[in-house]
Amino acid sequence: MAAAQPESRDGAAQSAKPASETDPLSRFTCPVCLEVFEKPVQVPCGHVFCSACLQECLKPKKPVCGVCRSALAPGVRAAELERQIESIETSCHGCRKDFVLSKIRAHVASCSKYQSYIMEGVKATTKDASLQQRNVPNRYTFPCPYCPEKNFDQEGLVEHCKLTHSTDTKSVVCPICASMPWGDPSYRSANFMEHIQRRHRFSYDTFVDYDVDEDDMINQVLQRSIIDQ
């Protein structure tokens, strides 16, 4: 199995993040679809997206980068990153077989054990529809789940936790997920630091329609997942 490669110029803004210390594959993960990059493209601000994901992000009249919120523009092919994706291996979380990163997306689309693994995660983080009656929560500022500090925006909470609580192993509720329509305010993440650095590197406001009911939202996510595969 190929070892992790030294930092490259392609995607350097992502690979330099501490998340790579807890998940060595994080620098090969698109911040939009959360899958291994497919035809990676580096935009002017330095972040990298799948080509198809970037095209979706560019559709608004004034597109912004979902990671840093700077103005978004078409980028250039991340050739070195693409080369590494063709050579580095990883294991399927379902069947545990090894594949090069470029093949893992196609594999998990048809792996029944991986689908079972994903559905268990969905059940753990999705509220029962019968329990959805509650007031619309504040989705703009969040408290730290580890300490009394509060009123962080999403990016501020990520940075605060990385700087202050990177070694804290306590299971906590993710305040960002708990505020979402599908969130479970009682679900405790076993590895919150890895979760927040991978799942919340971009702003949900850029991609999520909060007015869509949960069933429609889940269907949209599943359809997009199939298309991305």
Curated annotation (Swiss-Prot):
It is found in: Cytoplasm; Nucleus. Its EC number is 2.3.2.27. A zinc finger (C2HC RNF-type) spans 92-111. Gene3D superfamilies: Classic Zinc Finger, Zinc/RING finger domain, C3HC4 (zinc finger). The gene is Rnf114. This is E3 ubiquitin-protein ligase RNF114. Zn(2+) binds at C92, C95, H107, C111. It catalyses: S-ubiquitinyl-[E2 ubiquitin-conjugating enzyme]-L-cysteine + [acceptor protein]-L-lysine = [E2 ubiquitin-conjugating enzyme]-L-cysteine + N(6)-ubiquitinyl-[acceptor protein]-L-lysine. It holds the Pfam family zf-RING_UBOX. Keywords: Acetylation, Cytoplasm, Developmental protein, Differentiation, Metal-binding, Nucleus, Spermatogenesis, Transferase, Ubl conjugation, Ubl conjugation pathway, Zinc, Zinc-finger. Autoubiquitinated. Polyubiquitinated in the presence of E2 enzymes UBE2D1, UBE2D2 and UBE2D3, but only monoubiquitinated in the presence of UBE2E1. The modification N6-acetyllysine is found at K103, K113. It comes from Rattus norvegicus (Rat). GO terms for biological process: cell differentiation; protein polyubiquitination; spermatogenesis; ubiquitin-dependent protein catabolic process. Interacts with XAF1, the interaction increases XAF1 stability and proapoptotic effects, and may regulate IFN signaling. One of its GO terms (molecular function) is ubiquitin protein ligase activity. Its main location: cytoplasm. Pathway: Protein modification; protein ubiquitination.
